[in-house]
């Protein structure tokens, strides 16, 4: 699974390696086709506010936006692969400054908030939504379970920063945590 993280926010307190590992972990736990690609972009507040107005019609910056590349894309893993085995799942855009404020309000770390938002954005790309109360309950339940599994995997790895994704395949020689299924 290819996960690309680009930090264009100017925030120097974002652990991009760990964010990449988390995204791979979530994709693996959700049984997304291992040939899918995901990009995660971290942007400044102004850029996020511009995206928020342009695509959601709402003023001001938000914490996370998701942009699916192909609404018809079946993200589930399959034994059969089309002629083009690589499919773009989509983009998750995060705003570290908004996440920082939300983390302070929630009483947890900035990194924890970014992990929550990245997981949330990925779930949107996989078709989850929270427009209705029952959808919201389901999405939050899955989101919380994924984050708890991530925490358990990180603790099992001795608290080390996971260098790899759920499969540990990043070429760094340090395995990442394995997704709980």
Swiss-Prot record:
* Known EC number: 3.1.-.-
Q: What class of enzyme is it?
A: hydrolase
InterPro entries named in the record: MetalPrtase_cat_dom_sf_prd, YbeY, YbeY_CS
Q: Where in the cell is it found?
A: Cytoplasm
Binding-site residues, Zn(2+) = 120, 124, 130
User: Which keywords, in A-to-Z order, does the entry hold?
Assistant: Cytoplasm, Endonuclease, Hydrolase, Metal-binding, Nuclease, Ribosome biogenesis, rRNA processing, Zinc
Cofactor: how bound: Binds 1 zinc ion.
Q: Where is this region: Disordered?
A: 157-181
Single biological process term from Gene Ontology: rRNA processing
* Bias type Gly residues, positions: 161-174
Cofactor(s) for this UniProt protein: Zn(2+)
User: Which PROSITE patterns does this one have?
Assistant: UPF0054 (PS01306)
What Pfam families is this protein classified in?
YbeY
- UniProt family annotation: Belongs to the endoribonuclease YbeY family.
Q: Which NCBIfam families match?
A: rRNA maturation RNase YbeY
Summarizing the function annotation, the protein's role is:
Single strand-specific metallo-endoribonuclease involved in late-stage 70S ribosome quality control and in maturation of the 3' terminus of the 16S rRNA.
The entry's protein name is Endoribonuclease YbeY
Species of origin reads Frankia alni (strain DSM 45986 / CECT 9034 / ACN14a)
């Amino acid at each position: 699974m290819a996960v690309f993280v680009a930090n264009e926010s100017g925030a120097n307190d974002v652990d991009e390696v760990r964010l990449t590992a988390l995204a791979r972990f979530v994709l693996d736990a959700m049984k997304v086709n291992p040939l899918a690609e995901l990009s995660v972009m971290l942007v400044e507040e102004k850029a996020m506010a511009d995206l928020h107005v342009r695509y959601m019609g709402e003023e001001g910056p938000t914490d996370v936006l998701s942009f699916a590349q192909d609404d018809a894309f079946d993200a589930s893993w399959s034994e059969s692969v089309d002629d083009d085995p690589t499919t773009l799942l989509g983009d998750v855009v995060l705003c570290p400054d908004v996440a920082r404020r939300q983390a302070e309000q929630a009483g947890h770390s900035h990194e924890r908030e970014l992990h929550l938002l990245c997981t949330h954005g990925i779930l949107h790309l996989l078709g989850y939504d929270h427009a209705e109360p029952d959808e919201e309950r389901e999405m939050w339940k899955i989101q919380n379970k994924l984050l708890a599994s991530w925490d358990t995997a990180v603790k099992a790895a001795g608290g080390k920063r996971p260098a790899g994704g759920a499969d540990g395949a990043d070429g760094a020689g340090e395995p990442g945590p394995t997704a709980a299924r």
